[in-house]
Curated annotation (Swiss-Prot):
Sequence ranges on the Extracellular membrane side: 82-90, 169-172, 223-245, 313-354, 424-434, 494-501
Organism in which the protein naturally occurs: Gallus gallus (Chicken)
Glycosylation-annotated residues: N329, N343
NCBIfam families listed in its UniProt record: nramp, Nramp_1
The keyword 4Fe-4S is assigned to this record: no
Family listed: Belongs to the NRAMP family.
Induction line: In response to lymphokine or bacterial products.
Official protein name in the record: Natural resistance-associated macrophage protein 1
Cytoplasmic side: 1-63, 111-147, 193-201, 265-292, 375-405, 456-471, 522-555
Entry membrane topology: Multi-pass membrane protein
Annotated tissue distribution: Macrophages; spleen and thymus and at lower level in liver and lung.
HAMAP family per UniProt: NRAMP (MF_00221)
């Protein structure tokens, strides 16, 4: 049996011994070593101590100590891609799809709960666990899938930030200039953690507050009908909806649940000092992290709601000609030319959305919108960079210096964006948003299936392994994501013409299905289908009920 990397090689003897005897001996279960590779200097170097107290029950002091990772995670729910999806959904469907936003956020919370549990119980993030359990080829493929997801997300975030700079400068800063500014300030802000982890988390909290205030201001100014908003949130139906509304609903799910965010969150929870040998401390950490995540995602839901409701109230089924005429007679008349004079329904994006707000409610609304987009883009770009670092460290076990690793992970995402920004105008650039949201949805199984696999693996998770209800819920989410992806493919195929497109797409589709099937196979083994286990994959089939030596977890 061939090893796959130093850490994997260290696991093979125990596994081989167990296979030779044909037993599921707990002492031979391959588990990750406590410190597989020493980390270079990163966000995770500082551990936040948790106050000790004998007072039983919930403690707000402890909740405050655990507060931070959940709000950083929630920024992925507020990036420019989400904002654009929100405003398009409001303009196309009004308030009819607010319930989709609510339940997509709930589904995202369920995924983040698994990421929390994996990081807290094992002391390792999802990428590190993948490195130790998957053979070389599957784990390299998983790393590539996550890098593609991060690059796609980063393109949305950097483009959104560049558009914000363009709006704030009245077009004086070109898109490529905005991208260059984003590169510089992101690298600067990323080194804020040298002054303390809590200061960095406070800075992210400040950016979220800016988003809440700016988008909340737009909500108060437009004054949507509150009864209709509540009906849209709590009544799960869409009267009179067709294909266009369905595409928007599917796009919401793709925009809300980001694959790399699951990897990110499993890393962020490692920043709290938890004694993993004590089951009660692990249980308490899981509870407080989940509470914080619920609060953070509630805030993100409100901010997304503000955007969707504003455009659902003011711009639902607006015509280009009406918007053009309104802009001509406004204080931002220089933007009127971007809306053609015809009777077609206006198609909005981040750029046009800000312009429309300026045309209807004054220049202040435009600039406040741009500030909100700037905060969304800046914060999500920073967390995307951290996700890239953690994914690369975990999957490849790199020992690079801090600056080299930050520069490399930034370049992977920034260079494609800079190239696109230099040769496209605003309307073409923002039109990429739908495609990039589809990309996130397509790549989501490569995060959901591994985290479901390992949180169901009792040798790794002990008493914190997924129960039957958790397994069923996450299996339903995985099925929903796969169904969405099938819908996208079926909807996209008729737009292609000629074998030059169909043949490469067909090959990619076959490879995609094969890899998802592989992940489903290993996930099934972890869930107890031992008859599927062969060779090294017996590591996914052990039913361990006793302590497993070597795992720094609760016993």
């Amino acid at each position: 049996m061939s090893g796959s990397g130093p850490a994997m090689a260290s696991l093979e003897p125990g596994l081989a011994g167990s296979l030779n005897r044909g037993q599921t001996d707990a002492s031979n279960v391959p588990v990750p070593p406590h410190h597989p590779v020493p980390h270079a200097q990163t966000y995770l170097d500082e551990l936040i101590s948790i106050p000790k107290g004998s007072t039983p029950g919930f403690s707000f002091r402890k909740l405050w100590a655990f507060t931070g990772p959940g709000f950083l995670m929630s920024i992925a729910y507020l990036d420019p891609g989400n904002v654009e999806s929100d405003l398009q959904c409001g303009a196309v469907a009004g308030f009819k799809l607010l319930w989709v936003l609510l339940w997509a956020t709930v589904l995202g919370l369920l995924c983040q709960r698994l990421a929390i549990r994996l990081g807290v119980v094992t002391g390792k993030d999802l990428a590190e666990i993948c490195y130790l359990y998957y053979p070389r080829v599957p784990r390299v493929l998983l790393w590539l899938m996550m890098e593609i997801a991060i690059i796609g997300s980063d393109m949305q975030e950097v483009i959104g930030t560049a558009i914000a700079f363009s709006l704030l400068s009245a077009g004086r800063i070109p898109l490529w200039g905005g991208v260059l500014i984003t590169i510089t300030d992101t690298l600067f802000f990323l080194f804020l953690d040298k002054y303390g982890l809590r200061k960095l988390e406070a800075f992210f909290g400040f950016l979220i507050t800016i988003m809440a205030l700016t988008f909340g201001y737009e909500y108060v100014m437009v004054r949507p009908a509150q009864t209709e908003v509540l009906k849209g949130i709590f009544l799960p139906y869409c009267p009179g909806c067709g294909r266009e509304e369905l595409l928007q609903a599917v796009g919401i799910v793709g925009a809300i649940i980001m694959p790399h965010n699951i990897f990110l969150h499993s890393s962020l929870v490692k920043t709290r000092a938890i004694d993993r040998s004590k089951k009660e401390e692990v249980k308490e950490a899981n509870m407080y992290f989940l509470t914080e995540s619920c609060l953070a995602l509630f805030v993100s839901f409100l901010i997304n709601l503000f955007v969707m409701a504003v455009f659902g109230e003011a711009f639902y089924h607006q015509r280009n000609e009406d918007v053009h005429n309104k802009c001509v007679n406004s204080s931002v008349s220089r933007y009127a030319s971007i809306f053609p004079i015809n009777n077609e329904t206006v198609s909005v994006d981040i750029y046009q959305g800000g312009v429309i707000l300026g045309c209807y409610f004054g220049a202040a609304a435009l600039y406040i919108w741009a500030v909100g987009i700037l905060a969304a883009g800046q914060s999500s770009t920073m967390t995307g960079t951290y996700a890239g670092q953690f994914v690369m460290e975990g999957f490849l076990q790199l020992r690079w210096s801090r600056f080299t690793r930050v520069l490399f992970t930034r370049s992977l995402a920034i260079l494609p964006t800079l190239f696109v920004a230099a040769f496209r105008d605003v309307s073409q650039l923002t039109g990429m948003n739908d495609l990039l949201n589809v990309l996130q949805s397509i790549l989501l199984p490569f995060a959901v299936l591994p985290v479901l696999t390992f949180t169901s693996l009792r040798p790794l998770m002990h008493d914190f392994a997924n129960g039957l209800l958790g397994q069923v819920l996450m299996s339903l989410i995985t099925g929903l994501v796969c169904a969405i992806n099938v819908y996208f493919v079926v909807d996209f195929l008729p737009t292609l013409r000629g074998l030059g497109y169909l043949i490469p797409l067909g090959l990619l589709l076959v490879a995609y299905v094969a890899f998802v099937t592989y992940l489903l196979w290993t996930c099934s083994i972890a869930h107890g289908a031992r008859f599927l286990a062969r060779g090294r994959y017996n590591r996914f089939s052990f039913d361990v009920t006793a302590d497993v030596p070597g795992l720094a977890g609760p016993h």
